[in-house]
């Protein structure tokens, strides 16, 4: 009876999978876009130092509070936009970084330098010394339609080359997403998606089913 019950459960799971698959539009395929994009998305690791004030009840009676330096690491994603090593990412991924390290999809690692950044749009450009890289193709975000399938490609929680799928939930969203930290950095008119995005996805790619950056 246990074997029959397990078999029935397995059959039910398979049937559920088939029914979901049957509901997808004919010709819908994520694999081509995913395979085309993962080689264009990199893992970014940064190191920075901040000064924190150290308080001690005993010593503070005689001395002023002491400042101590503390090192910390951050990580995110980036998108290769040229064969000679220019990479776009979010400004908050590399902001105040003293060292920037880029790991490609093929596990090669490079030191990177900051070329330019714009806190207002939360964008930054970094550069690695490499040639013959796979650069992403650009789509036109104006052509993106609400309800259209898109893929989010990045490195959430340091899990490299992670792809999630969702739809475009809305366009031209206006929200000061960094307002709590940077009051002068409004991010406006961005694409909202329900694709799963986690810490570490910042700076990664949102692509259409042709593998084009939107």
Model feature map: region roles:
Residues 5-6, 49:
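General helical structural elements
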Residues 22-214:
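Serine-dependent protease modules
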Residues 6-17:
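Bacterial N-terminal signal peptides
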């Amino acid at each position: 009876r246990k074997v029959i019950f397990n078999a029935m459960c397995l059959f039910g799971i398979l049937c559920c999978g088939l029914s979901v698959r049957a509901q997808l539009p004919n010709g819908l395929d994520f694999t081509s876009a995913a395979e085309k994009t993962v080689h264009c998305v990199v893992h970014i690791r940064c190191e920075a130092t901040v000064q924190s004030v150290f308080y001690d009840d005993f010593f503070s009676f005689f001395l002023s509070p002491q400042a101590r330096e503390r090192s910390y690491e951050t990580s995110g994603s980036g998108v290769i936009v040229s064969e000679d090593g220019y990479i776009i990412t979010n400004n908050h991924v590399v902001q105040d970084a003293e060292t920037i390290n880029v790991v490609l999809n093929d596990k090669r690692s490079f030191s990177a330098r900051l070329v330019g950044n714009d806190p207002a749009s939360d964008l930054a450009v970094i550069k690695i010394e490499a040639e013959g890289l796979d650069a992403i193709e650009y789509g036109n975000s104006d052509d993106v339609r609400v309800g259209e399938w898109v893929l989010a490609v990045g490195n959430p929680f340091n899990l490299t080359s992670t792809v999630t799928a969702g739809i475009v939930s809305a366009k031209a969203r206006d929200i000061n997403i960094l307002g709590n930290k940077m009051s002068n950095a409004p991010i406006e008119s961005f694409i909202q998606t329900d694709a799963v995005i986690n810490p570490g996805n910042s700076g990664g790619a949102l692509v259409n089913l042709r593998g084009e950056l939107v």
